[in-house]
Design a protein with these regions (language model features):
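Flexible "cap/lid" loop of the alpha/beta hydrolase fold
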Residues: 175-189
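Flexible, membrane-associating and regulatory peripheral segments of lipid-active enzymes
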Residues: 1-98, 104-115, 124-137, 161-165, ...
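Short beta-strand/loop motif that positions the catalytic acidic residue
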Residues: 68, 196-199
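Alpha/beta-hydrolase fold nucleophile elbow
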Residues: 134-146
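Glycine-rich nucleophile elbow surrounding the catalytic serine of serine-hydrolase chemistry
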Residues: 70, 143-154
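Active-site nucleophile loop of the alpha/beta-hydrolase fold
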Residues: 167-176, 200-204, 222
Length: 295
């Protein structure tokens, strides 16, 4: 489900949507960006809106709320999104909303990247609405994968950098940090929240080697192939490399899902490089945990 190699229809759809946006522009952002929420008592998606008169019936203002934002060509009905929402409700509880911006994401890559600022601002507007309905900014978490990491950062900046936790899952590199970094108002950076984390799992291709948060975790050096993404039975080198970096890009999601269970500890060590880490030569030696349970 998560390998783009299996998404031929997605590529065709992206081509058609790109032509449509270039010729006719986009719809109102409230049409193109939607919020699909679940709670401990209501684990199935319920759509919520800015200025929703029934919002306190759909969500519990007394409980924490997290927002999960997908990346390029994705949507909230992907298996990984639904599994993450289900795990969050089961293991953490409270409220979680999946942010669907698929009409703006299912287009040519650079066009999708240019769409991210307005998506992030609209997410920020939705959070602002929730704050008027009894939610506390101190209970908000923003999580995003790939381009969704930058959307989460933009939303955090829109909210004045006051969100306690912003987490980027293998934040996208191309068009954001490479070939040259864009301005911080268009990407994730450490000023977007009170504590910003990023985990890197495919830093050299889809992701980035640039540190974006207060803490950046480079899982297994942060590069492809991640464990389980080797594809040893694939003989064609080009196909193998492609499958490896796509699989590795989505490993960040798997690591985040696993980290929702307190029994799984994803401990990182502050170090100047992965080479130094492998040599046990980390002068600071500071250790901390990735995810919501960061100390």
């Amino acid at each position: 489900d998560d390998l783009l190699a299996n998404r031929v229809g997605t590529v065709i759809g992206a081509f058609g949507n790109t032509l449509s946006q270039l010729l006719f522009g986009t719809n109102d952002v409230s049409t193109d960006v939607t919020f699909w929420c679940a709670t401990t008592n209501q684990p199935e998606y319920v759509q919520a809106y800015v200025d929703d008169p029934r919002i306190t019936q759909k969500l519990d203002p007394s409980k924490p709320i997290a927002f999960l934002t997908h990346g390029w060509t994705d949507n909230v009905n992907r298996t990984w999104v639904k599994q993450t929402v289900a795990d969050y409700v089961r293991l953490i509880g409270g409220n979680i909303c999946a942010v669907d911006w698929s009409p703006l994401a299912l287009v040519e890559y650079n066009l999708a990247a240019r769409n991210t600022p307005k998506v992030g601002r609209y997410l920020g507007k939705f959070v602002q609405f929730l704050l008027t309905k009894g939610f506390s900014i101190n209970q908000v978490t923003l999580v995003g994968h790939s381009m969704g990491a930058h959307i989460s950062g933009i939303a955090g900046a829109y909210l004045g950098g006051q969100v306690p936790s912003v987490i980027g899952l293998d934040p996208a590199g191309p068009a954001f940090t490479k070939p040259i970094p864009v301005s911080t108002d268009r990407r994730l950076d450490r000023t977007d929240g009170r504590f910003v984390q990023a985990i890197h799992t495919d830093k050299n291709i889809i992701g980035t080697t640039m540190n974006l948060g207060h803490q950046d975790y480079y899982a297994n050096s942060g590069a492809s192939p991640q464990p389980g993404c080797e594809f040893p039975l694939v003989n064609n080198d080009t196909t193998k490399a492609y499958l490896q970096f796509i699989c590795s890009h989505f490993k960040a999601v798997e690591y985040f899902r696993a980290s929702l269970d307190r029994q799984n500890i994803f401990e990182g060590t502050a170090c100047s490089s992965y080479y130094s880490y492998k040599r046990n030569d980390c002068s600071a030696g500071t250790k901390d945990d990735f995810g919501l349970f960061n100390k």
